[in-house]
UniProtKB/Swiss-Prot annotation:
Catalysed reactions, semicolon-separated: carbamoyl phosphate + L-aspartate = N-carbamoyl-L-aspartate + phosphate + H(+)
Pathway(s): Pyrimidine metabolism; UMP biosynthesis via de novo pathway; (S)-dihydroorotate from bicarbonate: step 2/3
Task of the protein: Catalyzes the condensation of carbamoyl phosphate and aspartate to form carbamoyl aspartate and inorganic phosphate, the committed step in the de novo pyrimidine nucleotide biosynthesis pathway.
The keyword Ribonucleoprotein belongs to this UniProt entry's keyword annotation: no
Protein name: Aspartate carbamoyltransferase catalytic subunit
Cited InterPro entries: Asp/Orn_carbamoyltranf_P-bd, Asp/Orn_carbamoylTrfase, Asp/Orn_carbamoylTrfase_sf, Asp_carbamoyltransf, Asp_carbamoyltransf_Asp/Orn-bd
Record EC number: 2.1.3.2
Species whose genome carries this gene: Bacillus caldolyticus
Similarity-based family: Belongs to the aspartate/ornithine carbamoyltransferase superfamily. ATCase family.
Pfam families for this protein: OTCace (PF00185), OTCace_N (PF02729)
SUPFAM superfamilies for the chain: Aspartate/ornithine carbamoyltransferase
Underlying gene: pyrB
Residues where carbamoyl phosphate binds: 49-50, 99, 127, 130, 252-253
Length: 308
């Protein structure tokens, strides 16, 4: 089954294949399934970029998108995530994309459903497609990962982006630096070294800024937005100390004037909107992988045989 739960479960050669496939889609490749295929997007947390880019990717691939709104579904009547996914499988959906507030929600589904599941973010756990689009953006800029220094700055403890990126970047040969408030350090993450923010920015080839995950905090932030920006944000002054050729990434949504000065969001070094563009191509590659796996192993195999 071609699930995608976390990049840590994929070998590097498969990650490179997905990036190569995304580049082919960026260059204009067209792929269509041999027969109608259906996908449902189950987003139990707010999303703009991830949800819309998945929908764009699905339509570019010619897939049929089944509307699903948790607020108007039987989830409101107490239906479990498992029963929701099994229902969609039973009515003929070929794959589901899920964002959920619970860490590792997919473990209850991994061996229990017969259709591919694509993780669009699980709590503080993993965000594999965000990491893939970040990798694609970095590779477009530098050509490779070995020897690069990537500084991940901000709310490390609560960030699934930090967790996913640090692991895969380390496997790819990059040097990962962490920086941020002491109370948001993640001492359980072995894939980076903590340094002061000024050092991280000065050393980095890639400055990756993180949104403060207010919705995951048990307590409110002890700093005002202005204080956070001054202490930990990418200010105009800090940006002037970046290496020549260094780039700025941010998974968005961006809080202008908090983790990054508003003037830097679309500055020459910023690749923030390039990341969003790449997100469509990466998700096309991931969906193609899921659908081809479905053709080989699931209900679609029978359809495929019939239409030959």
């Amino acid at each position: 089954m071609t699930h995608l739960f976390a990049l840590s479960e994929l070998p590097l050669d498969e990650i490179h294949r997905l990036l190569d496939e995304a580049e082919r889609f960026r260059s204009g490749r067209i792929w269509r399934p041999a027969a109608p295929m259906y996908v449902a997007n189950l987003f139990f947390e707010p999303s703009t970029r991830t949800k819309c880019s998945f929908e764009m990717a699905e339509r570019k691939l010619g897939l049929h998108v089944i509307p699903f709104d948790p607020e108007r579904s039987s989830v409101q009547k107490g239906e479990t995530l498992y029963d929701t996914v099994r229902t969609l499988e039973a009515i003929g959906v070929d794959a589901v994309v899920i964002r959920h507030h619970e860490d590792a929600y997919f473990e209850a589904l991994r061996h229990a459903v017969g259709i591919p599941i694509i993780n669009a973010g699980d709590g503080c756990g993993h965000h594999p497609t965000q990491s893939l689009l970040d990798l694609l953006t970095i590779r477009q800029e530098f050509g490779a990962f070995t020897g690069l220094t990537v500084a991940i700055i901000g709310d490390i403890r609560h960030s699934r982006v930090a967790r996913s990126n640090a692991e895969v970047l380390t496997r790819l040969g990059a040097n990962v630096l962490f920086s941020g408030p002491e109370e948001w350090k993640d001492e359980t993450n072995p894939y980076g070294t903590y340094v002061e923010v000024d050092e991280a920015i000065a050393r980095a080839d890639v400055v990756m800024l993180l949104r403060i995950q207010h919705e995951r905090h048990a307590e409110t932030m002890g700093l005002t937005k202005e204080e956070y920006h001054a202490r930990y944000g990418l200010t105009l002054e800090r940006a002037r100390r970046m290496k020549s050729g260094a780039i700025i990434l941010h998974p968005a949504p961006v809080n202008r004037g908090v983790e990054i000065a508003s003037e830097l969001v679309e500055a020459k070094a910023s690749r923030i909107f390039k990341q969003m563009e790449n997100g469509v191509y990466v998700r096309m590659a991931v969906l193609k992988r899921a659908m081809e796996g479905r053709m080989e192993h699931g209900r679609m195999a029978e359809k495929w045989h019939v239409v030959q």
